[in-house]
Design a protein with these regions (language model features):
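Conserved acetyl-CoA-binding loop-helix of GNAT-fold acetyltransferases
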Residues: 68, 74-87, 110-114
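Conserved acetyl-CoA binding element of GNAT-fold acetyltransferases
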Residues: 53-70
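Conserved beta-strand in the GNAT
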Residues: 31, 37-48, 62, 67
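A short, internal acetyl-CoA/4′-phosphopantetheine-binding micro-motif in the GNAT/acyltransferase core
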Residues: 31, 66-74, 102
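C-terminal "cap" of GNAT-fold acetyltransferases
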Residues: 102-104, 115, 125-148
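Conserved GNAT-fold acetyl-CoA-binding loop/helix
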Residues: 1-22
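Conserved GNAT acetyl-CoA-binding A-motif
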Residues: 82, 89-101
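A short helix-loop-beta-strand connector motif used in the catalytic cores of GNAT acetyltransferases and
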Residues: 21-31, 62, 136
Length: 148
């Protein structure tokens, strides 16, 4: 997050470390590793009702907190995440892969669209205690890809 902030990319003001620990314990946090080096980390959810609202129908895997090690940027780490998510979704009879990102970062939105994600809408997340602190009151772009 620090490096992204230094490069003028928007970053979270804070992060819910207890939530991260819970995701790890619940096997919802993943990493791509090569030779003991972490190349990329990401988390998944199977429900995201506060952000996806009426579209959240138990038919999707939601990708969150995708972070690529800066030393491995530009080496298709996201493609590895997406390929894994597509296989997982298909083998679990899920129809979509969904994610959200900063609404005002057209560069990252276009990047995800280049992989086939469709822009659904911009949305301001609620200030709900059920959301992790870093996900409250954000303007996000909602993206999804059909994997059927």
């Amino acid at each position: 997050m620090k490096l992204q902030g230094q490069k003028n990319y928007k970053v979270w003001d804070s992060i819910d470390f207890d939530g991260l620990k819970k995701d790890i314990l619940n096997n919802l946090q993943y990493k791509i590793v090569r030779d003991d080096t972490i190349l990329c980390i990401f988390s998944v959810q199977f429900s995201d009702p506060y952000i996806w609202r009426d579209r959240d129908r138990n038919d999707a895997i939601y990708l969150h907190r995708i972070v690529v090690n800066p030393l491995y940027k530009g080496q298709n780490q996201f493609l590895k995440v997406l390929t894994w998510a597509q296989k997982f979704a298909r083998s679990n009879n899920l129809d979509f892969i969904r994610m959200d990102t900063w609404a005002d970062n057209q560069k990252i939105i276009n990047y995800y669209r280049s992989f086939g994600f469709q822009f659904i809408e911009n949305f301001k997340t609620p200030n709900a205690a059920e959301l992790p602190i870093q996900n409250r009151n954000l303007n996000v772009a909602l993206l999804e890809i059909d994997v059927k």
